[in-house]
């Protein structure tokens, strides 16, 4: 018999407005401790100095993390023009400078090439692996390396404000795997003046918004208090981008055992990923085929 996991079998989502100076994993650790949860994980890393929406899943909700990770996310960020750094943000050393400053119209005109399906080279200081080692570890050791470009979908890149000649604030909505620091670096080069990220805030991630966020201070004040559970959002929130297929009690029982189960008529396409529900409660995620859901993830969070 396997060893019982420590902590409570609590399930759901909580959104934290991550403060600057903490890693995403450090915030996950604080959340897991505060809820005394058996399991916790986040749906998309934020750099330590970045702030904003960090969606964290507890318990059975961790099975829905991939669907939030795959969803679009929005970032508001300020680019410092005229300086390149070795980290592509304000934490690194300045490596190149320029006195050139583009006009607002020149900046707007430079944005469209960064939209749509693009190829992006991650920063030297990033978590991508090069020959089995994290790029940032090699960069800290003074090694320069070539990092292969990676595909990224950018839904939009929008001019927001120009606080002063040295700074421009933009909003980017993109898919998973994007580095805002790389956008700032490459935009600066395209403008002929260099650039790096001065500040970065994630404003939404899939179904989760800043208005859903719990301040870290509240989390710490209510740690181990049952009242903290009131801040949890349902597991089903992480499935918002997938079709919901209501099922019968018999279908739910079959899916709970890992077998295909009957679902009621829906608009889901044959072969589409969807989730089955019974009385609004998620039963399983899987592939829809001819009136049945073939489960790939089954939720065990209470009787149906």
UniProtKB/Swiss-Prot annotation:
Keyword Amino-acid biosynthesis: no
Region spans: Disordered: 85-105
E.C. no: 5.4.99.25
Catalytic activity field: uridine(55) in tRNA = pseudouridine(55) in tRNA
Alphabetical UniProt keywords: Isomerase, tRNA processing
Alphabetical GO biological process terms: mRNA pseudouridine synthesis; tRNA pseudouridine synthesis
One Pfam family in the UniProt entry: TruB_N
Thylakoid as UniProt keyword: no
Catalytic residue list: 47 (nucleophile)
One Gene Ontology MF term: tRNA pseudouridine(55) synthase activity
SUPFAM superfamilies per UniProt: Pseudouridine synthase (SSF55120)
Function noted in UniProt: Responsible for synthesis of pseudouridine from uracil-55 in the psi GC loop of transfer RNAs.
Family note: Belongs to the pseudouridine synthase TruB family. Type 1 subfamily.
HAMAP family xrefs: TruB_bact
Protein name, entry field: tRNA pseudouridine synthase B
């Amino acid at each position: 018999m396997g060893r019982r996991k420590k902590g409570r079998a609590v399930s759901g989502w909580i959104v934290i407005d991550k403060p600057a100076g903490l890693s995403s994993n450090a915030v996950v650790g604080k959340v897991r401790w505060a809820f005394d949860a058996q399991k916790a994980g986040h749906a998309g890393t934020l750099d330590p100095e970045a702030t904003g929406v960090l969606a964290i899943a507890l318990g059975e909700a961790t099975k829905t993390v991939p669907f939030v990770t795959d969803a679009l996310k929005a970032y508001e960020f300020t680019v410092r023009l005229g300086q390149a750094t070795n980290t592509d943000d304000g934490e690194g050393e300045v490596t190149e400078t320029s006195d050139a400053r583009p006009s607002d119209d020149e900046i707007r005109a430079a944005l469209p090439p960064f939209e749509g399906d693009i190829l992006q080279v991650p920063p030297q200081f990033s978590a991508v692996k090069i020959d089995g080692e994290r790029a940032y570890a090699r960069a800290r050791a003074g090694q320069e390396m070539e990092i292969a470009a990676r595909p990224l979908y950018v839904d939009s890149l929008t001019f927001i404000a120009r606080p002063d000649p040295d700074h421009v604030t933009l909003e980017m909505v993109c898919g998973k795997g994007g580095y805002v620091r790389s956008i700032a670096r490459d935009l600066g080069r395209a403008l002929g003046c260099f650039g790096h990220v001065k500040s970065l805030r994630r404003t939404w991630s899939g179904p989760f918004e800043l208005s859903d966020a719990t301040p870290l201070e509240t989390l710490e004040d209510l740690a181990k208090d049952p009242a903290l559970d009131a801040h949890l959002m349902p597991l089903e929130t992480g499935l918002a981008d997938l079709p919901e297929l209501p099922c019968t009690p018999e279908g739910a029982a079959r899916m709970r055992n890992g077998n295909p189960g009957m679902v009621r008529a829906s608009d889901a396409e044959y072969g589409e990923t969807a989730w089955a529900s019974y009385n609004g409660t998620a039963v399983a995620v899987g592939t829809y085929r001819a009136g049945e859901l073939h489960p790939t993830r089954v939720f065990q969070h209470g009787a149906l």
